[in-house]
Amino acid sequence: MKANHRTLLAVAVLCGICLLTVLSIPRNHTIRSVARVQVETPAGTVPILPWQVRVTYADRTREWRQVRWSGTDREAEAELAARPAGSVYRVQGFLLGDNATEEGYPVEAEVTVVADPRPGPVPVARPLPLRDVRLTGDNRLTGNRDLDVRQLLSLDVTRMLYNYRDTYGLPTEGYARPQGWDSTDTKLKGHGTGHYLSALAFAYAGTDDPALRDSLLVRIRRMVDELRACQERTFVWSDRLGRYVEARDLAPGEELYALKGTWEAFDRYKKDWRSYGYGYLNAIPAQHPVLVEAYRPYNNRDWVWAPYYTIHKQLAGLIDIAENVGDAQVADKALLIARDMGLWVWNRLHYRTFVQEEGTPEERRARPGNRYEMWNMYIAGEVGGMQESLARLSGLVADSEDRARLREAAGFFDAPAFYGPLAQGLDDIRGRHANQHIPMTVGALQLYGLTGEPRYYAVARHFWELVQGRYAYATGGVGNGEMFREPYTQMLSLNTNARTGRQGIVHPDPDINETCCAYNLAKLTKDLNGYDPDDARYMDYYERVLYNQIVGSVHPEHYGVTYQYAVGLNAAKPFGNETPQVSCCGGTGAENHVKYQEAAYFVSDKTLWVALYLPSEAVWAEKGVAWRQDCAWPAESSDITITEGGRFAMKLRVPYWAGRGFEIRLNGRRIARSFVPCSYAEIPERDWKAGDRVSIRMPFGKHISFGPDKMETAVTEGQPQTPFAPMWEGALMYGPLVMASPDITTWEQAEFSLDADLHEIVPCGADAGEGTMGHVYTLSLDGKTFYPDYYLTDHATHYLRLDLH
């Protein structure tokens, strides 16, 4: 699209945090209106600039377009953060996919620095509990769920318990040895058992089938009973101390530095479970987390893996049982185990650790237990969602002293080296291990809920905004080789990890979009949405990552889930990880497919938000309200029928991709003449009666999700070359769906010259192909067929080289 800057037209459009002033260009589908953004930012921070703006074309159609902003290197960001209050400055940006310049269509942001920091928000809405929402119908969602549940019920419980019994000196005869990352020769063992507990709890909450619940409960009860038996072996009284042996008593003083991390040492530690400290529960001895205080590195042979990561998985699993399982005896025992383990964490970190931010790394490590250094170590310092679990746990226990200690324990996982820059809006994501740090931002939001300190909310919000604008792919996933790379380099990442294929041809085969990252980004998004449920960007993103990575991350016919996802050229989904013990993504994969509905509906005292269009039945227990949502999946139309009435307002998400033909009717009458994409349409508070029906029509349309950089010759040594002229790369979208083609196997085949209105792309309708479960939308372009990503299992190409004119 060639821009023409002859005419200037000022139009004010409210778009999230920005006020838009637009340029007019009178051509058919060329840009008529683009954004100049005006924002305020507190002194000492980098501004949050929008990563999408509303664009109007000459034919008066509109859509959201992505923006890439300049000045993202560390030095430039530090300079912006240093601007004093009262300063006004401009930041240059470009709309992606446009050929007005080599970098895109120019836009500009005007930033005003203000003195006062923004106050932190208060929680507005909460998702309906998982037990109160049921998926319905015969579709890909319910098919995946049922496949997951069958797999959970097929697994050998003894394999989940073997390492615990071995670590606590209990007989292991008749117990199968686990495999994968939970095998006896890894130091991450226990993580898969925690995920298994969570998956069982979610499966239990998501069904109303009594027989299925009974089958799940048998496994849950045995797991809880045996884990408690292991934990009780740490209840060791010391006459010398006049109390039970506690976490703080393990390896005091110089003994900490004498601890070894070898397997020979760990075999000795397993014989000394009496020293672990009251309440310790893990599949590996307590010396494992203690070694982190001496800054021992990630090394499975000689030192540690990720001790607190495994502790978190077990805590999370037990808490999920306590919150979701209807058997009071089992739920109470799970909570008791979690409480005692949470208090072990408090005891150890309260008495044996501290925070010192000043000085060199050597000075900060002069004595053991500096949490600034502990939580900033690669992998060894990975803590999963410890803040989140301890915060949740503090809200479940009855004793006030226990509650206070658990809240304090959650605060011990404050990570100054990571949180500090993010609180200022500085991009400290680059170069970090993705799934080590995404859960830490989930934890920051939980700490905000506990303390009310705005900096914690700023950490979570800034992280989310940076991910959306600088790091996410069209599928919603992030990461290359488990890492955040440099900002705005997604397309370069697609051309990494050279492999030699047939005929000796070198081709890229990148490890892109770890599935655990999608799991945790969805969790962060759901939690942020509770603070601002009217900001439809949150659930637009949740829909994107759910539909285009999570749903497609399990094979629809035989159970297997992905670790890295398939986003590159002619990439195949690497299904495997058949049990939660095989890998981290085997663990999150076991959970993913039994909780699709967890963010479908949010409620406040007087309002219901319909956030996702999924075939489901739901109950709003506090109001005695119930409804049924009837639709296909994915849905171009949906009917919400009230089955038990009450008084409330209803807000329905208008997706960012909504276009012509979108409408909402209440009992047959339109509620508005027009709707704004990426917003919520409100039906004001009213008395709803059984039989009232809300009908949503949302025809899918075509658009492109562009990468922020143009793929040229790869600059990484040893990578395959792409000797092409620089072009925009983008993924073809149909409504919320990323469309990919198995007919494209080379970058030459992926190159297209298209009109900006994309009329060359022909929709074939929902009946064009039969899917594994239900009908499948397809598109046709130049003799090549495109399918939704979730439908594809083998080789396909997502990103195309595009010249729009």
Question: Which residues make up each language-model segment?
Answer:
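Helix-terminus loop motifs that line ligand-binding clefts
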Residues: A211-R296, Y471-M483
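Serine/threonine-rich, repeat-prone extracellular segments and beta-strand-based repeat modules
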Residues: D59-T112
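Bacterial Sec-dependent signal peptides at the C-terminal "C-region" and cleavage site
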Residues: L8-H29
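Solvent-exposed, low-complexity, repeat-rich "mucin-like" stalks and linkers
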Residues: N28-R62
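Hydrophobic, small-residue-rich alpha-helical packing segments that form membrane-like cores
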Residues: L336-P439, Q446-L450
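C-terminal beta-rich recognition modules with glycine/proline-rich loops and embedded aromatic residues
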Residues: A460, M539-N548, S553-T641, V676, ...
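Short strand-turn-strand beta-turns centered on an Asx-Gly dipeptide
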Residues: R665-A672, G735
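Aromatic (Trp/Tyr) and acidic
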Residues: V11-C15, G120-P210, A247-R274, A286-V325, ...
